[in-house]
């Protein structure tokens, strides 16, 4: 099931619909039983949610928050080259938000961990869903 073709197929709204549908398919397929009591989960008919008729547990798709960071100094931008990874090109700094951490704290921690710099003048640019890895 190679869904990578959605990255380059168009029009974009159809590609987005295909990626979203595949992500939901994976989620429904991987969440069949209640994590509390083991009973079979039921799909809700009005929202993207599964529920347990036995213990009333509800489950929603989980989205992992991630950040991509452009560290700049004037007209210069800091790129990183990850060691010991399959991806060998230069890239912006990035990482996942940990439990109890704000997105701003994630940015500061990731920059410190990856390149040892303190972040100043933090500015938000925009968000983008990334359904291939269930991240935002």
Where are these regions (language model features)?
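Acidic, metal-coordinating catalytic segment for phosphate/diphosphate chemistry
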Residues: 18-67
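N-terminal alpha-helical interaction blocks
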Residues: 1-15
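Residue-level detector of flexible, active-site-proximal loop/helix-junction positions
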Residues: 41, 84, 131
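N-terminal strand-loop-strand
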Residues: 46-92, 96, 118, 123-124
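N-terminal phosphate-binding loop and adjacent alpha-helix
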Residues: 102-103
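Glycine-centered helix-boundary capping/hinge motifs
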Residues: 1, 38, 116-118
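Active-site segment of metal-dependent pyrophosphate-handling enzymes
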Residues: 99, 116-136
């Amino acid at each position: 099931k190679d869904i990578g073709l959605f990255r380059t197929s168009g029009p974009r709204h159809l590609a987005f619909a295909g990626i979203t549908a595949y992500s939901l398919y994976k989620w429904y397929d991987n969440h069949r039983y209640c994590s509390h009591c083991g009973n079979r989960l039921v799909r809700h008919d009005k929202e993207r949610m599964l529920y347990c008729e036995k213990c009333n547990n509800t489950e929603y798709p989980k989205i992992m928050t991630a950040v991509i960071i452009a560290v700049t100094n004037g007209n210069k931008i800091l790129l990183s080259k990850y060691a010991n990874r399959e991806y060998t090109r230069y890239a912006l700094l990035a990482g996942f938000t940990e439990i109890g951490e704000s997105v701003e704290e994630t940015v500061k921690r990731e920059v410190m961990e990856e390149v040892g710099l303190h972040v100043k003048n933090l500015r938000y640019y925009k968000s983008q869903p990334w359904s291939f890895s269930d991240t935002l």
